[in-house]
């Protein structure tokens, strides 16, 4: 534990804005309560909606809760506000805190800020991108975990990994450790506000996403993403995928070194047997390998881990084969480009793919997606929602059936009815 960590938060009046239900807010609250902070927690969700999170905090006394709303008065008289990712850019409550000269922090960036302030020699590897960041994050973590098995060094996961909070890592990290952080654009807002970047930054891809939040302001979206490298120092590294490298700006201004990571079927290292499907995953592997090399990890360890890495749940994950029909789960593909990448990975099955998708819309464009989909599939099943309406409009006339459903049960019923031996049912 960092010695400063024991007393830094003690007695501070801290407002947590956004408890949530995925665990990160709960873990931040527990950590701060252990450090004797005076806590207020506010969330737009109601007590009923937050029941699972509140249950985990019920043994902690003296937390003030303001639920189902925010009160402007709570954003004054505090020593710090810790906001959750996704708080609106124009939040009047954050504006009130800033007006009252209250520091506004975020979990991941505050962790990095404090390790830097306390001159702890912890290497932070940050990964962002529209696609691939979770796979790259977990592959880097797996490589380092294997490499550090018999070492004093430890590796930890942080950032946007589900259920994990970064601040509690202050209890664990020590000199020489590495923290691997998946970072979305919202969390990188915090890095920009703190004017810090990871020691090693990985930028996988850049594609439109979260445009319902950014109100179609791609420059603002990119600006938040660019905080992954914008505040790097001499001696730091930026590792970029080829797609991201085309749009990266300011890359020569901060003294950090940078490299574009590439891999294709033609240049897979000799003797490597890779299990992950798809060209996009070869780029993900290349990014992770470059990071491992920059950290001095032996090639044998890298090769062993890459060959044993099977990917993550929901990322073109093979589920089962029944009656000759293969089922794949790619539900983390929430943009048209990500779904097309999955189809391209299964291109040997062109004309044999039953695609299940659609649903809610994030203010994205679907014209190219609709035309490309036609090249791969034999049937399309779409969950009702704004995205589905746009996809159906963009498709026009088709030679394959298009169905709109309101439940997974109905989607699978239709998919099975349209499938035969040798087909693929893909949820993406």
Write out the residue ranges for each language-model feature:
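N-terminal leader/targeting and accessory segments in enzymes
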Residues: 1-106, 110, 117, 277, ...
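Nucleotide phosphate-binding/pyrophosphate-handling subdomain across enzymes
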Residues: 2-13, 19, 28-35, 121, ...
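Phosphate-binding loop of NTP-binding sites
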Residues: 7, 33-34, 72-76, 85-237, ...
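Short beta-strands and strand-loop turn motifs
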Residues: 17, 107, 203-205, 425-428
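Generic hydrophobic/aromatic pocket-lining and core-packing "Φ" positions
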Residues: 26-29, 94, 225, 366-370, ...
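Residue-level signal for inorganic ion chemistry
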Residues: 32, 81, 127, 182, ...
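Short internal beta-strands
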Residues: 37-45, 238-242, 353-357, 376-386
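C-terminal helical cap/extension that packs against the catalytic core
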Residues: 52-64, 70, 367-423
């Amino acid at each position: 534990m960092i010695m400063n960590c024991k007393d830094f938060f003690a007695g501070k009046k801290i407002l947590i804005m956004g408890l949530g239900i995925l665990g990160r807010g709960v873990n931040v609250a527990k950590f701060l309560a252990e450090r004797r902070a005076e806590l207020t927690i506010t969330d737009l969700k109601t007590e009923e909606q937050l029941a699972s999170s509140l249950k985990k905090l019920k043994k902690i006394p003296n937390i003030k809760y303001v639920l189902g709303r925010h009160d402007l008065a709570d954003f004054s008289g505090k020593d710090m506000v810790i906001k959750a990712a996704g708080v609106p850019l124009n939040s009047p409550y954050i504006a009130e805190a800033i007006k009252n000269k209250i520091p506004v922090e975020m979990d991941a960036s505050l962790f990095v800020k404090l390790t830097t302030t306390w001159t702890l020699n912890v290497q932070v590897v940050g990964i962002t991108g529209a696609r691939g960041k979770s796979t790259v994050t977990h592959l880097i973590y797996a490589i380092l975990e294997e490499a550090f098995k018999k070492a004093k060094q430890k590796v930890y996961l942080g950032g946007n990994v589900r259920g994990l909070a970064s601040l509690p890592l202050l209890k664990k990290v020590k000199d020489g450790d590495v923290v691997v952080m998946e970072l979305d654009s919202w969390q990188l807002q915090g890095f920009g506000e703190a004017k810090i970047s990871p020691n090693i930054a990985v930028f996988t891809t850049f594609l439109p996403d979260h445009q319902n939040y950014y109100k179609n302001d791609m420059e603002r979206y990119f600006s938040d993403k660019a905080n992954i490298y914008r505040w790097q120092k001499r001696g730091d590294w930026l590792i970029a995928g080829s797609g991201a490298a085309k749009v990266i700006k300011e890359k020569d201004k901060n003294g950090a070194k940078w490299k574009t990571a590439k891999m294709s079927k033609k240049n897979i290292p000799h003797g490597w047997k890779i299990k992950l499907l798809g060209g996009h995953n070869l780029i993900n592997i290349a990014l992770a390998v470059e990071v491992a090399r920059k950290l001095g990890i032996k090639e044998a360890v890298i090769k062993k881990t890459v060959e044993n890495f099977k990917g993550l749940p929901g990322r073109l994950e093979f589920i089962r084969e029944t009656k000759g029909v293969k089922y794949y789960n790619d539900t983390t593909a929430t943009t048209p480009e990500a779904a097309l990448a999955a189809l391209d990975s299964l291109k040997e099955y062109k004309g044999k793919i039953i695609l299940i998708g659609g649903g809610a819309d994030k203010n994205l464009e679907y014209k190219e997606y609709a035309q490309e989909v036609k090249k791969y599939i034999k049937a399309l099943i779409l969950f009702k929602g704004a995205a589905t309406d746009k996809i159906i409009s963009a498709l026009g006339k088709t030679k394959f059936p298009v169905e709109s459903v309101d439940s997974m049960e109905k989607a699978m019923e239709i998919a099975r009815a349209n499938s035969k031996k040798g087909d693929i049912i893909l949820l993406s």
